[in-house]
Curated annotation (Swiss-Prot):
GO molecular function: 4 iron, 4 sulfur cluster binding; adenylyl-sulfate reductase (thioredoxin) activity; metal ion binding; phosphoadenylyl-sulfate reductase (thioredoxin) activity
Protein name: Adenosine 5'-phosphosulfate reductase
Key words of the record: Cytoplasm, Iron, Iron-sulfur, Metal-binding, Oxidoreductase
One biological process term in Gene Ontology: cysteine biosynthetic process
Function: Catalyzes the formation of sulfite from adenosine 5'-phosphosulfate (APS) using thioredoxin as an electron donor.
Species annotation: Bacillus pumilus (strain SAFR-032)
PANTHER family according to UniProt: PHOSPHOADENOSINE PHOSPHOSULFATE REDUCTASE (PTHR46509:SF1)
Cofactor binding note of this UniProt entry: Binds 1 [4Fe-4S] cluster per subunit.
Top-level taxonomy: Bacteria, Bacillati, Bacillota, Bacilli, Bacillales
InterPro entries: APS_reductase, PAPS/APS_Rdtase, PAPS_reduct_dom, Rossmann-like_a/b/a_fold
UniProt catalytic activity: [thioredoxin]-disulfide + sulfite + AMP + 2 H(+) = adenosine 5'-phosphosulfate + [thioredoxin]-dithiol
Active site location: 229 (nucleophile)
This protein's record includes keyword Zinc: no
Stored Pfam families: PAPS_reduct
């Protein structure tokens, strides 16, 4: 089994010129290789909705983890409920941080996401994901190369130094248009905030509509130098 500890550049070749741009063949390999030891950390944005639909074609009881910071939009929780209804076999887990938002306010000051967004993301996202991935040799992510310069070098299989794991990214070759074509063709239910100018959706206090169509993540942590929550750095 390919793990972080025995990592070597994989010699596996995935078919990249098919209808799914390699995504389905990557998922078939990943679940064939890792089985129940593969977990998908999903934000339930449109990429996540597409990837869940692809996952369900391969493993109907796959484990899906959502990092429930307690600060998400109501529309995000409604989307999760819709996904649960459409794919009842999936094992969808909402992972919460150690501290509630109120406890965090008491211990670290009100609205830490404004005063120290890096620490807020670390406590409410990074640490919970570390806990959720504990014991799993690999995890799935919906990263696409097109999303940002930092993500442009992502491969199908990646040695993840952050979480000491193997990160599997089936959608790296998909464009924004590919994502929406698939969602439309398969009639997928998605977060309605996408139709209100939010291409990238995270916690409500730190997410605004995108300022430019060229940078789909420009609405995240607006007014700060922060561009990632820390999960993919």
């Amino acid at each position: 089994m390919l793990t972080y500890e025995n990592w070597q550049e994989p010699s596996i070749t995935f078919q990249e010129d098919d209808l799914y741009k390699g995504a389905l063949s990557v998922l078939k390999w990943a679940y064939g290789h890792y089985g129940d030891q593969l977990v998908y950390a999903c934000s339930f944005g449109i990429e996540g909705i597409v990837l869940i639909d692809l996952i369900a074609k391969v493993k109907k009881d796959a484990r899906i983890v959502f990092l429930d910071t307690g600060l998400h939009f109501k529309e995000t929780y409604d989307t999760i409920d819709a996904v649960k209804e459409r794919y009842p076999g999936l094992d969808i887990v909402l992972k919460t941080p150690e501290l509630t938002v109120e406890e965090q306010n008491d211990q670290h000051g009100d609205q830490l996401w404004k005063t120290d967004p890096q620490s807020c993301c670390h406590m409410r996202k990074v640490i919970p994901l570390q806990e959720a991935l504990s014991g799993y040799p690999a995890w799935l992510s919906g990263l696409r190369r097109e999303q940002s310069p930092k993500r442009a070098g992502t491969n199908f299989l990646n040695k993840d130094e952050k979480f000491k794991s193997v990160k599997v990214c089936p959608l790296i070759h998909w464009t924004w248009k590919d994502i929406w074509r698939y969602a439309s063709r398969e009639e997928l239910t998605y977060n309605p905030l996408h139709d209100q100018g939010y291409p990238s959706i995270g916690c409500a206090p730190c997410t605004q509509p995108a300022f430019t169509a060229q940078d789909l993540r420009s609405g995240r942590w607006s007014g700060t130098a922060k561009t990632e929550c820390g999960l993919h750095e």
